Amino acid sequence: MSESVLNMFAQQYIDMILCKSRYDVGDIQWFTEGPFWRRTSMKFSREYRILPDYEIGDLKHGLTLENIVDRSETLLRELKDYEETSPLCEKQRIEYLICHMRSLWFRSKMLLGEKSSFDQMTSALYNLVAPVYDYSLFQQIKTELDENLPGQGNVLNRIEQFREGITIPADKLLNVLRDVTEAFHRHAIQNMHLTGNSMPRIRVRALPDPNMVFLSILFAYDYDHIQYERNFNLKYNWTVDKVMEYTGHEMEPGHLTYYEKRTQCFIDTGWPEMAEVSLYSPSSAFTEGSARYASDLC
């Protein structure tokens, strides 16, 4: 009975998140409506990045932001009341739902114009607060770089000079991206218990905006397979560090691996909250941190 109660809370959370996406473009980073999905239409574009990768249709209609604020606030109170008498085995899941319901509530209020401090925002959205630093430390680091970096000019100029030397020519880009993607893919298989079925298809093309790094298209997913294409922008200034960032961090063993594992968790548990990753949520913070850590380990 208790699991069905939590599933009810979780499904209401998902319903509200999807409705909020009407007012919060780009918020839905990943969504698995069921245990598998396959694109059945050729109505997609390799020219424009549209998130999510497939149309959620009527699921994003039915609630205003004011509705979402009121309902999420009520559900937060009910979740906290339920937590007081819940068994120990449910505590972690309840904490997850409370944190994510709070981020939904807070983000909806932001969209309605409510202001807050930076620390209040990160605490409510991501369950994180930036540590306090003595900023003189950064000046000390800058001074050490200034003394030791080769080249002429200030630190930023010398960094740019160095980056020019690791810029990848456009005619070499596809081979470099494929080789690096394959290397990260092998490391992920060896160290993260993956089937190896989700290596993305890599393409390069001139996208409309030179600041647009890539365009992603999802074609299908199931329990242990994500069929995925990534189009990298030939107009972007590609350097070695950017290739590492946008392959390992963004794909395997980073975000793509996380989405595969999360989809498996959704199917294994049947918990509705595992079906979705919102940009403005603690799950998003974990997505970014785990991708950084995993790609650095490779």
Describe the role of every protein-language-model region.
Residues 1-298:
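N-terminal maturation segment of proteins
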